[in-house]
Amino acid sequence: MPTISQLIRKRRVDKIVKTKAPALSYGFNNLKNKVQKYKSPQKSGVCIRVTTMTPKKPNSALRKYARVRLSNGTEVNAYIPGIGHTLQEHSVVLIRGGRVKDLPGVRYHIIRGILDAKGVINRKQSRSKYGSKKNKN
């Protein structure tokens, strides 16, 4: 426990909080031709490569992901959730933050049901997360 005179000489240092989705925390201003810091909940981008990746040790699968060039110029890896997708190169997608625990380097999710990422068909539960419409029965 420091004394008051010690705190006057050297104040307490705040902890530096590192962002978990850094590509969403800035954008590129084309008018001023420079990067500006502001936080966004989502960003749009264009798929450069759509491929699969194997997860870390105890799990085994082929997880689908896309390399996306965002509107601020950065390239990120984004996970494609749900069963089946129609994404290919040059597809325009919207991404959100949120990592995939067993895929190293994947810190973002593609939002299904918006732009070129179609919703999951025949999905009954958690439809809003996968952009699926309600079945007409």
Curated annotation (Swiss-Prot):
Question: Listed GO cellular component terms?
Answer: small ribosomal subunit
Question: Any idea which residues bear 3-methylthioaspartic acid here?
Answer: 102
CDD domains given in the database record: Ribosomal_S12
Gene Ontology annotations of biological process type: translation
Coiled coil residues, start to end: none
**InterPro entries cross-referenced by the UniProt entry:** NA-bd_OB-fold, Ribosomal_uS12, Ribosomal_uS12_bac
Q: Which controlled-vocabulary keywords does the entry list? A: Methylation, Ribonucleoprotein, Ribosomal protein, RNA-binding, rRNA-binding, tRNA-binding
* Entry keyword tRNA-binding: yes
What GO terms are given for molecular function? Answer: rRNA binding; structural constituent of ribosome; tRNA binding
Give the record's subunit note.
Part of the 30S ribosomal subunit. Contacts proteins S8 and S17. May interact with IF1 in the 30S initiation complex.
Sum up the protein's function in the record's words.
With S4 and S5 plays an important role in translational accuracy.
* NCBIfam families linked: rpsL_bact (TIGR00981)
Family listed:
Belongs to the universal ribosomal protein uS12 family.
Name of the protein described by the UniProt record? Small ribosomal subunit protein uS12
| Source organism of this protein record | Phytoplasma mali (strain AT)
Gene name in the database record: rpsL
